[in-house]
Amino acid sequence: KYYDKDPHRNIVMGTTFDAVVEKSDFDLIRDWAKNRGIYDGGDVKTQYMKLAEEFGETGKAILNNDMPEIIDGIGDMVVVLTNLAELAGTSIEECISAAYKEIALRKGKMINGTFVKDE
C-alpha cells in the first residue's frame, strides 16, 4: 500500500496505487486459464464451441427464470470470452472498448424489447 505523510495526497495516491496494483477479474481469469493450460492447449475454435455451450445453458436458465443460474451462465460466458479473446491475440478489455466506441453515439429506438439502431 502507498503511504504519504500528507493525508490528502495519501488518499488520492493510495487509491490510485491500489487500483493499479489490484488485479482485475479479467487478470484473475487469465491467470486461472494459464495455470490450467488453456492458452497452451486450447484454441479459438474450441473456446467458441464452449461459448455456444454456455450460451445454451444461459438461455435455459433465462427460460426457467432461474436467477442463480442466469448469473452463473453470464459469468461463465465472460470467462470463455476472456479466454477466446486471449487465444485470438487480443484482450477482452480491448474488445469491450472497441465495441463501446462503436455504439457510444449510436441512435435508434426500442422495438419489441430490443434496441434497433438507425440506419
What are these regions, as identified by a protein language model?
Residues Y2-I74, V78-E119:
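Flexible "arm" and connector segments at domain edges
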